[in-house]
């Protein structure tokens, strides 16, 4: 039997030969000790140990996660507060980040989202309460910084229309705007010729994707106005006075000649509310799920569409009601009357919350902006007025129009549209927080028929016009808010997302009893009720449990509890309390002197109303 000869000393085994041919992998953090020759392939030198000093060293102050005994269960180390502002960590390549940490936030941007006034000092309270207040303030500051940082993601900007040198934008026609914009925006301008069923009232859905319109001769239709896809089209064979979408585009209400009807997006009648008869105007409150109706009989009715019950039926005692709008800020209903007044209503009160004398004649139209700050009214005296709703409801500006405005509408960014006969004028202010300037119109458009309805489309620079000749979609640059909240009103939501949103909205429904002029008052402390409860408690117990107990010195030993020492200690405490009272009175004296130094105003005279 022959045996294979063993390899000699000079002959290497096959396995050893393969190992010598294999090159060591070169890491990208390793640096060459010497420059390689031209054309030579770079690589680590042979038969030399790897230089370990070139590898990045792990910082010593980093807490590594401990290995879990349970397989597959990740553990996340908690970062101590002291290590938040450490020096920037090195990358694997050993280079430092030239811009370590998050990008700085400008103070002006962070102040816009801040809800805590840092200028006010924290009250002197217990240490535990003070620590809680400090933690809450730190959390609010972090939230405001995150909100300011996320604002950078809102890349959309509002549009605008700017003329050339000295050019009046009111003279720019819609055809010129359509030629200047892109194809997608140009498709949003269209006309529907529906003369045989007019005049028309129209309304956009809350997300701004769908359009519902109803003609005076019974024609009712809804469509996706972006894609021009018709959802339903019916003829109710009865006069249609107003139409409104409910909380979504799946339901809409129609005020017909006799009763109020509710339809779905396929045109099927779901409900007929006979208690709401001879309705002239409709308004929907989305956060309360309330449908407000104004009728010829002078009643303002609130219908809860989530349970199908009448919440309140209020008699305005002002005759026929055909002028109504809502305040989006506090959900208060504004009614215009024939005596020139505008009344503000809430379902929790049987009497109006306030009455404003706006015109010498009857009120023809009322509109409130999205912030609830300004109200626009027009009357039979051909006056168009802007009122401030924050204080004493004083008029800010007024303008006499050649023809009285019969319809008014505010956009999301504060533009005011007024329909006068067959002409539509649009005014714009200096900014979103300023009222619209009535001196010079921003845009003007003439229609083929008399205007009977105005509504700005949410999140689109489009104004919907309903007139005797049909429907017109007008382009208004800078009218809408460019960025929308995807969790609140998402124009691109699917059917499942809409269903989930409906469930959440129903769970978060605001009760009708909470509608008031100032919604911030709900978060304030009811001092009157608190004092009344405290008084009743004192009468019931016979003493005040919260009153400060009189000072009782503690007994001491070794003769220090004698009568003289006890009296001395009581007197010392009384002197301290007296000094505190004197100090407080001295601090209040300068304020009283300043009030006395102010000159008293003269008594008002009956002739002051003639002074301009």
From Swiss-Prot:
Principal location: nucleus
GO cellular component terms given for this protein: nucleolus; small-subunit processome
Biased composition regions of type Basic and acidic residues, renumbered to the chain: 574-584
SUPFAM superfamilies: WD40 repeat-like
Pfam families: BING4CT, WD40
Region (Disordered): 1-134, 539-612
Highest taxon in the source lineage: Eukaryota
Tagged with keyword Nucleus: yes
Gene Ontology BP terms: maturation of SSU-rRNA from tricistronic rRNA transcript (SSU-rRNA, 5.8S rRNA, LSU-rRNA); ribosomal small subunit biogenesis
Residue positions, PTM Phosphoserine: 41
Entry's localization field: Nucleus, Nucleolus
Biased composition (Basic residues): 14-26, 112-130
Oligomer status and interactors: Part of the small subunit (SSU) processome, composed of more than 70 proteins and the RNA chaperone small nucleolar RNA (snoRNA) U3. Interacts with DDX21, NCL, NOP2 and EBNA1BP2.
General function of this protein: Scaffold component of the nucleolar structure. Required for localization of DDX21 and NCL to the granular compartment of the nucleolus. Part of the small subunit (SSU) processome, first precursor of the small eukaryotic ribosomal subunit. During the assembly of the SSU processome in the nucleolus, many ribosome biogenesis factors, an RNA chaperone and ribosomal proteins associate with the nascent pre-rRNA and work in concert to generate RNA folding, modifications, rearrangements and cleavage as well as targeted degradation of pre-ribosomal RNA by the RNA exosome.
UniProt name for this protein: WD repeat-containing protein 46
Source species of the chain: Canis lupus familiaris
Source organism phylogeny: Eukaryota, Metazoa, Chordata, Craniata, Vertebrata
